[in-house]
Amino acid sequence: MMATEKISPGMQQYLDIKAQYPDAFLLFRMGDFYELFYEDAVEAAQILELSLTSRNKNAENPIPMAGVPYHAAQQYIDTLVELGHKVAIAEQMEDPKQAVGVVKREVVQVITPGTVTDSSKMGADSNYLVAIDRQGVQFALSYMDVSTGQFFVTSLDDFTSLCGEIRNLRARELVIGYALSEEEEQVFSNQMNLLLSFEDEVTEDVQLIDNSLTDLEKAAAGKLLSYLHRTQMRDLSHLQKVVHYEIKDYLQMDYATKSSLDLLENGRTGKKHGSLYWLLDETKTAMGMRLLRTWIDRPLIDLKRIENRQAVVQVFLDYFFERSDLVEALKGVYDIERLASRVSFGKTMPKDLLQLSQTLGNIPAIKNILQQINEPALGNLVAGLDPIPELHALISSAIDPEAQGTITDGNIIRTGFDETLDQYRLVMREGAGWIAEIEAKEREASGINNLKIDYNKKDGYYFHVTNSNLGNVPDHFFRKATLKNSERYGTEELAKIEGQMLEARDKSANLEYEIFMRIRQEVEKYIGRLQKLARTIATIDVLQAFAVVAEQQHLVCPRFTDQRELTIDRGRHAVVEKVMGKQTYIPNSIHLNTDTHMQLITGPNMSGKSTYMRQLAVIVIMAQMGSYVPADQAELPIFDAIFTRIGAADDLVSGQSTFMVEMMEANKAVRLATDRSLILFDELGRGTATYDGMALAQSIIEYIHDKIGAKTLFATHYHELTDLSQTLEHLENVHVSTLEKDGQVTFLHKIAQGPADKSYGIHVAKIAGMPEELLQRADRILQTLENQAPTAPTHPAPSVVEEPSGQLDLFADTPSHPVLDELEKLDIYNMTPMEVMMAVAELKKKI
């Protein structure tokens, strides 16, 4: 835009508002359209496939312009937000017909990926807005689902933990309360693909932010609230009091672990199907579905809480018919959490209140079912089923069950609720009869057989007279409009009736609106009780879902022990089993204790090593959620964390290879795991040379065995490592058995004691469909190699390095190299594998 160009007052208003929201698409209301200008118009036209036009087309520099109809704007807003953009909505704040000069406009809301509450693309899943603050090396993280008002805060000790928690929350927008470093911005923006927003102001709300929080936690929570108030510009009375949590209070799993175990989505397809969530989701309500995802994300480590959940599941299993009735009743429960939020936002529609009324009407039936069961395990759930009878009575008596559309469409309030409104409606009904009487009377008096009364907004009520009958028009008719083939007439009598009817209609519409707003304000008083009810319903729903799945999948109740024993008899991977359908799943048992806490697993690819490892992790997660588990019998310790390295593609976004990712994930395990953790490593070291890979694999096994003592499953293709069982007393060898007959190999998918004797790689290639000629050539090469002297070590390195003998050193007089001196000082047996790698890398630079 040229500086010398003259800007109209309207465009100047646009530019002034746009300057306040430079990082958002500004939808500028102009009549029946939201218009976009300049760069916003160009970019939005491309994204939304809009026609790009221009304002002042004859000017030297026309202003690019694009627009969307106001009544269809939501779908365009949803698309922009879904793609990670912010959208600022500038509305007309006065009637353009009564405006003096430029119509007053203001931004009434900024919709962002983290604050969206009613997008058609949102679904029932939680949508978290995350805020962070920093003080030294300490971080605080606060997050909220604006659509439900749930509000949380925690502290983290380092940047890695912070990023891990943000990933776990699957956040799309991050509110930052401190000055970011370039490295942090690179991680958040490029690697984690977050929309970054910044907030300096802290909202101090004693109703929401507890004084028991640390100052840093208060700052993070307060900045999140401040950002919300700045962008939403509406009532947020549905926000719940912030809940402080500690990450260590739950079974800890990082994002990579959850992805590799297919907990919330299938890691290969990105879809729900084939995930643990898919298996367990027999919920019937939106609240239950969200809570189930939370429970999968955060299994418990508190035995009492786990056993409380198990007890309810057992009750629901014992009372099949009552559970069936409960399931039917839950189907009539709507999303109370989001309905309550819509009340707070002032966006409640008649259908929302009807859904709320229907839900409250179902609560007594649900409560009665649980009371009939009369089991102590259900006591707290029964107590939490508050039917709020006074609210149900208000809505059911006030809102017409056939009410449709918006609050200005009329016919919302039930007949009999308000006497004055009933009188207005009576006038409108009787007026219709009066008009019919006038029409019949004038038709007979005039002799115009096709005389009729019609209505439109411009002319109101009128007599429609065709040109052929104009000679018969009575003298007391007065002309209202002339058309090509007819004319429209009125009479004083018709005008009087019309006036009464229109007055009654307008007063009726205004009164209905007032009544609806009063009801909405009354409903707002119950938001807290509705949210508590929603939590109870969600818990009941998830636990009945656990019972349904336990029955369908033949699951058993796991027992927990503090003796560090892990025994699973004929365990199964329930997700794989369900996906297989009618095919037979081969179960496997596992026993680990203080004497044997590591298994080294060998066997061919595709034989089931990874499934066996995942099976154990999924059973642990299900058990600590309070669910039953797929086994004939299960006795488990309570784990504090699960660490995995089970397959992954190269991390192309961050520029890290498969091997680097392997080492980073292995390093995380050896640094953070305890003797109460579960470690699952699959083919660790495969991403580098044979010597390097086997050396690292052995060193990591030894470190976990000697220093950590965590329950560990370690699958490897390095057959030489099986000899470690001779020196590591807590390690045992197991393998996936095969049946070889007449040159054909069958994978039995059964875990057996001892190491595998072959890898069967060529057979796997055959299954994959490799050409026969290629396979025959590979077999000949294999036989040749097997007959030659081995080029790789046939045994692992000794667990303890022997001291040198007394033999003379030919180079004894050679001066020592500084690198050798530093190398000699390294205490490698008290270092993690990653620390050894980093030290060697530094020494290489000095050579």
Curated annotation (Swiss-Prot):
Keywords: ATP-binding, DNA damage, DNA repair, DNA-binding, Nucleotide-binding. InterPro entries: DNA_mismatch_repair_MutS (IPR005748), DNA_mismatch_repair_MutS-lik_N (IPR007695), DNA_mismatch_repair_MutS/MSH (IPR017261), DNA_mismatch_repair_MutS_C (IPR000432), DNA_mismatch_repair_MutS_clamp (IPR007861), DNA_mismatch_repair_MutS_core (IPR007696), DNA_mismatch_repair_MutS_N (IPR016151), DNA_mismatch_repair_MutS_sf (IPR036187). The keyword Nucleotide-binding applies. One of its GO terms (biological process) is mismatch repair. The keyword DNA-binding applies. PROSITE patterns: DNA_MISMATCH_REPAIR_2. GO terms for molecular function: ATP binding; ATP-dependent DNA damage sensor activity; damaged DNA binding; mismatched DNA binding. This protein is involved in the repair of mismatches in DNA. It is possible that it carries out the mismatch recognition step. This protein has a weak ATPase activity. This is DNA mismatch repair protein MutS. It comes from Streptococcus suis (strain 98HAH33). The lineage of its organism: Bacteria, Bacillati, Bacillota, Bacilli, Lactobacillales.
